Structures are given as C-alpha cells and as structure tokens.
C-alpha cells in the first residue's frame, strides 16, 4: 500500500507570500486555512512507518510539524520517520529545507549529479554532516530503491526521468557547478510500490508537455503536475514580475499548449496540480479558473491532503 501526503502545494514563496498583496495573497490572509499553501513537497511511504520526501521546501519544519505521520515516535528522544529526501531540481524551494534537517538524524539525499554539484558548491550545506547524511547520485532512466536508515529495503522503486526545464534561477548567467550540458536539472519521478504495482508520478516543474511525457504518464493512478501559472503571462499582466511561466520553466495550466489541454486525452485516474503560484487564479475556490480546472478533472489540493494507492 502506497501512502502519499501533500506537505505543500504552493510555488516559491507559498500563499500568502510574505511581501505580496496580489488578490490570491490578500484573500488567503483574509480567509485563512482554505487558501494557505506552503511550498511544494510531498511525502510517501510503503508501510506507513518509514517515509521519503520529494524535495525539501523552505517550509519543511512547519510541514513536518503539521504532519502527524512524520512526527518522532512516542518515547524517543531523537527520532524521525524520514529516511530520505529525493530532489527533483536545485531550486531554492526544493533544497533550502535540507538546512532544517541539520540536527543529526541520519537520512539520505538522492539527487542527480548536477544537483548534488550545486549542493557541494554551496558550503552552507556542509552543516549536514556527511557521517549522518549520505548524498546518493541518481541517474535518468535508471530505477533505484531508496533504502531505510538501517539499509533495509523500502519496497519502493523510484524511476527518475528528464522533463523539459531549466537550471535553478540563481544560476542564470553563472557557471553551473554541474556543467552546462546534459539533462538532470529538472526531473520527474515515477514512484512504484513493488508489492502492489501501484504508482504515482511527481512532475512539479515542466516547461512543456511533450509527446514523450504524455506516453510516460498515460495510464497512471495518480499524477502530481506543475500548476505554477494559469496563463503563461499572468505575472506580467498582474504587475508581479517580468517573466513568463515558460521562461521560468513552467507550462501554463490553460491554453492550447497548456497542461489541461495537452493531458486531456490521457487515462489518468487522479490529477492534482502542485507548485501553484500565488498569482494563479485557480487557487481561488470561487474563480472561473478553478471551476474550469475541476471540470477538466483536475484537483487543487490543500496542504495535508493524503492519498492511499
């Protein structure tokens, strides 16, 4: 049985963002829990006892405390159910939370060599003592089984695959520690319970829905997909920025080439948008954009949403 918990469904900055007065952030401050979103991450487990995180958001401490499944076991002075963290990119909102896991509990960080090179180039991550926190390279199209802290098998297979994307924004115009060529900056993941065969996909950053990507996820029981923006130029139109979604590595939800249209013909049991920006009107429960997304079979999840496969 595969259990999945949405730790955070928001994009960088979350909802409300600390310095933002857009409609989404104003509404979130006014109505509270229904709209609040921390930054994107999910946790999964094959046995309900040992858990793995996909990405470590800057909100990780808050997310762990808000998720009973991830609390230390009763009676233990030092303990965590978290056995590992799998990184799908090197963006701040995917790696900064690692710094909140510096208190000495052992776990493994799984990431592509390009992302591990970013961590190695930033000495602040040395606070994660290598005696306790192992860094394990993963490769595109090479499945692996993340291990429990004692080295035991988890019973879960993880398949990393390349998706259209870009390197972290803070590396734009700078030398990439992991090299300028080759894939690896942006990964999707297929997570499979080796006992039941049930699986889900995690694709929180994707610049384009390609035919190869469609073929990969067709027939899935569950897909978490990039829901950063509703339309490509929404941040520009709202006066919130000067970049399009695609230039930031994110396909829009709407439009002819958007995720809703491009994935409409696939056989997917459950589709959830993740990494939703505060500018995205689909966050607002009464908006026409939310209605359109839900009528197309998509869910806008709240933090704490749990799914069992």
Curated annotation (Swiss-Prot):
Keywords: PQQ biosynthesis, Transport. Pathway: Cofactor biosynthesis; pyrroloquinoline quinone biosynthesis. GO terms for biological process: pyrroloquinoline quinone biosynthetic process. The keyword Transport applies. Belongs to the PqqB family. May be involved in the transport of PQQ or its precursor to the periplasm. This is Coenzyme PQQ synthesis protein B. It comes from Bradyrhizobium diazoefficiens (strain JCM 10833 / BCRC 13528 / IAM 13628 / NBRC 14792 / USDA 110). The gene is pqqB.
């Amino acid at each position: 049985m595969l259990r999945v918990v949405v730790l955070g469904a928001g994009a960088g900055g979350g909802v409300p963002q600390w310095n933002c007065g857009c409609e989404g952030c104003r509404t979130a401050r006014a109505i509270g829990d229904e709209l609040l979103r921390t930054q994107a991450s999910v946790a999964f487990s094959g046995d309900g006892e040992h858990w793995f995180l996909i990405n470590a958001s800057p909100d990780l401490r808050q997310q762990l405390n808000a998720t009973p499944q991830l609390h230390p076991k009763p009676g233990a002075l030092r303990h965590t159910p978290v056995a590992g963290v799998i990184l799908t990119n090197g963006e701040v909102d995917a790696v900064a939370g690692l710094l909140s896991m510096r208190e000495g509990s052992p776990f493994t960080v799984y990431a592509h060599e390009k992302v591990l090179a970013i961590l190695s180039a930033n000495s602040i991550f040395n606070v994660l003592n290598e005696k306790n926190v192992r860094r394990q390279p993963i490769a595109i199209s090479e499945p692996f089984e993340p291990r429990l802290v004692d080295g035991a098998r988890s019973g879960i297979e993880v398949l990393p695959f390349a998706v259209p994307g870009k390197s972290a924004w803070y590396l734009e115009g700078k030398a990439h520690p992991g090299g300028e060529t080759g894939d690896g900056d942006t990964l999707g993941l297929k997570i499979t319970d080796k006992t039941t065969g049930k699986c889900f996909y995690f694709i929180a950053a994707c610049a384009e829905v390609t035919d190869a990507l469609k073929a990969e996820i067709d027939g899935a029981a569950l897909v978490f997909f990039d829901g950063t923006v509703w339309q490509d130029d929404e941040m520009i139109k709202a006066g919130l920025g000067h970049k399009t979604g695609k230039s930031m590595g994110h396909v829009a939800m709407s439009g002819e080439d958007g995720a809703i249209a491009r994935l409409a013909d696939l056989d997917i049991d459950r589709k959830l948008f993740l990494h939703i920006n505060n500018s995205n009107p689909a966050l607002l429960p009464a908006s026409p954009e939310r209605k359109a997304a839900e009528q197309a079979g998509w869910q806008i999840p709240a933090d704490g949403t749990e799914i069992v496969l």
